[in-house]
Amino acid sequence: MNPYDAKDRRWILSMFFFVVLFCNNVSTSSSSSEVITIKPRHLSLLKSALQRSSGEQSDLWRPLTDQGWSPCIDLGNSPSLPDKTAGYVQVFLDGGLNQQRMGICDAVAVAKILNATLVIPYLEVNPVWQDSSSFVDIFDVDHFIDSLKDDIRVVRELPDEYSWSTREYYGTAVRETRVKTAPVHASANWYIENVSPVLQSYGIAAISPFSHRLSFDHLPAEIQRLRCKVNFQALRFVPHITSLGDALVSRLRNPSWRSNKEQKNVDHLGDMTNPHRRQEPGKFAVLHLRFDKDMAAHSACDFGGGKAEKLSLAKYRQMIWQGRVLNSQFTDEELRSQGRCPLTPEEMGLLLAAFGFDNNTRLYLASHKVYGGEARISTLRQVFPRMEDKRSLASSEERARIKGKASLLAALDYYVSMHSDIFISASPGNMHNALVGHRTFENLKTIRPNMALIGQLFLNKSITWVDFQQALGEGHVNRQGQIRLRKPKQSIYTYPAPDCMCHV
């Protein structure tokens, strides 16, 4: 039964318009010099969304049917590893967690191609995320090494004779053992022709930069499957991430968790994950909302914050990219009609409501720092009052080990996302791509927004709620997790079929 009757909905609606008026006089700022007003941009649609009837579509939460594809990464009777390898391969990975994740998979593949021993990859500190977490802080290194013991040799650290080969060593001068010319999406032959000689001469090769440095095409089937084995089996988060993730999933599925917590003040991680206390598990969806300042600035789109916001984002764009942003040459209307603008929290709320999610939906918000803060999120929260995130679900004690660590926070969001009934992302990106591929591999429902269609619908300021719902529904019939075969140049990490899945 919907706890919000007609009287309650009228009260919520009246409070919403009070907030709108209030927001006109309240500013958010990412620095003391910025004064940016945030207010809803799609008032007509928002009014309809807040007044929508309760009760969701009967097939909304229905799992995907068997599509005739299953995981297929068994490498079969692989030949035993040679007694001696060609040397040691190091890689230095930049980017955020999921870009680094893909780089790790590529590093294993390159080590296999070269018959080399892989040193546990070094994770660079990203200037945006500012997290110094290492591989062993994020991933279960023992599981990683054990999972790959029949495929390649992996070592935690270099032997003493090569201990000089460090990040600092390569940052101070040109070194013969550093390979820095690997092209984007390099072929297997490129590595054999250019890295093998370095291994033969020095016994070690350090490849940097390495992100996106291995082709998705023209590779042996066993190399492709090895990449998927790393991604879907060998890379497992450290126990404290999976334990906390399991606790959050349990709380999302337990509708009485919060009232029980308030009444009994029970221990979060222990009592509330006790299987004997569980009721019939509920369903929940995950919304991945990548709406950070760097993404908003790089998109060059208008997000309704007025002249102050435009100037602020333009200044940030100049500071980070020195004006080298392709989107800057297009108008906001052109960018939106092409689907090149990330969706705001408000727009994602309208999108989910139009798909049929009602205000009883348990929605988990997977995000880092939303540009505009709570003022930007407030509209989404009004449409989905039962929205949660890692901060609302976990105690401060539970969050202590991951506080301020963007990669560990992203790992927790990734884990919860993989255990949700439905996943949807507000914009393309590495986390979106990684989760789409992983959930495809596991045959889990994943809504892939048609960004161009959505952008065009939001440009139509006179569109009715009924027409908005109908257009979205028709435009996403085949975008809910159906298998899509990888095309040339597409990522195996986003499209694991047919390379890593077998058609039964």
From Swiss-Prot:
Pfam families: O-FucT. InterPro entries: FucosylTrfase_pln (IPR024709), GDP-Fuc_O-FucTrfase (IPR019378), GT106_glycosyltransferase (IPR052272). It is a single-pass type II membrane protein. The chain crosses the membrane at residues 11-27. GO terms for cellular component: Golgi cis cisterna; membrane. Signal peptide: none annotated. It is found in: Membrane. Substrate binds at residues 288-290. GO terms for biological process: fucose metabolic process. The keyword DNA repair does not apply. GO terms for molecular function: glycosyltransferase activity. Its main location: membrane. Pathway: Glycan metabolism. It comes from the Eukaryota. Disulfide bonds: none annotated. Keywords: Carbohydrate metabolism, Fucose metabolism, Glycoprotein, Glycosyltransferase, Membrane, Signal-anchor, Transferase, Transmembrane, Transmembrane helix. The keyword Ligase does not apply. Its EC number is 2.4.1.-. Glycans are attached at residues 115, 359, 460. Belongs to the glycosyltransferase GT106 family. This is O-fucosyltransferase 39. It comes from Arabidopsis thaliana (Mouse-ear cress). The gene is OFUT39.
